[in-house]
Amino acid sequence: LRTLEAVPGVHPVSHHLPGRITTLYPSAPLTVTPLAAWGAGGRTVVALKLTSTVSRKVVLDPRALQGNFVTATFQHRWLGPAGTPEDTTTLYLVTEGRPDRAFIAEPARRNATAVHKTG
């Protein structure tokens, strides 16, 4: 169901973000997954899915977000316990320019299949 008409000047953009973001809200027990992004006038709005990973309520606080954002808003102020209908919400972030530059880089992943030679 589409409830809004296209807005002149607003266009979809590629967010160039990893499939899972761990550096955005490291203090909260949740997973963060990028959904979509839209741009206009040098700014970008990024929609991210937040899902609880614990069996208790998680209260969301935009002050705990890590990165360089113009503003942020959550669709809901809290997440329910994992596995409940309330365990997921959407976070909307506004960034200047490309969104991938506003996020803290993900830590380098070690190759689990690497073979280490010993001496």
Show where each model-derived region lies.
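Intrinsically disordered, low-complexity Pro/Gly/Ser/Thr-rich segments with frequent PxxP/GP/PP motifs
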Residues: 65-105
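Asparagine-centered strand-capping/turn motif at beta-strand->loop junctions
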Residues: 48-55
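Long, low-hydrophobicity ectodomains and other hydrophilic envelope-associated domains
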Residues: 20-25
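Short beta-strands and strand-coil junctions in structured, solvent-facing domains, enriched
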Residues: 55-58, 99-101
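Surface-exposed beta-loop interaction hotspot
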Residues: 1-19
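Short, solvent-exposed loop/turn segments enriched in Ser/Thr/Gly
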Residues: 42-46
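Extended, charge-rich intrinsically disordered regulatory tails
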Residues: 102, 106-119
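Short, solvent-exposed beta-strand/turn "edge" segments of beta-rich domains on protein surfaces
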Residues: 35-40
